[in-house]
Amino acid sequence: MTEQKAKSSKTSSEEAKKQKELTEIKIKLKSYDSRLLDQSVKKIFEIVKETGSKFCGPIPLPTKKEVFTIIRSPHVDKASREQFERRTHKRLIIIKNLKNETIQKLKRFVIPSGVELRIYL
């Protein structure tokens, strides 16, 4: 009997973990264009509001700034340089009380080119 109780407690804890995983997802969005990123976040929020799920965010994550320095002249002037910069904007959305309808609508959501979308379960 103790073995059965141990097995049942293990399975119930595993089921609880699975259920917890399915009730919350995290969506991470990245883009070089902050306006395009904000438009995508608004569309995702509209989908989540329609289906009745709860959400947190958008949580702005740190912007990654990359600077590239290039010599302007192909031959002599090493002192003459030009700098280019690329900023990667990031947002995090947490959706709680996830419903099947929400998942289906998010699957059909068309992501604009220039926005990277990752979903973490």
From Swiss-Prot:
Gene Ontology terms: biological process: translation
Entry keyword Secreted: no
Any Pfam family: Ribosomal_S10
Entry's Gene Ontology molecular function annotations: structural constituent of ribosome; tRNA binding
Domain of life, per lineage: Bacteria
Region (Disordered) location: 1-20
GO cellular component: ribonucleoprotein complex; ribosome
Protein name: Small ribosomal subunit protein uS10
Organism listed in the record: Mycoplasmoides gallisepticum (strain R(low / passage 15 / clone 2))
Record gene name: rpsJ
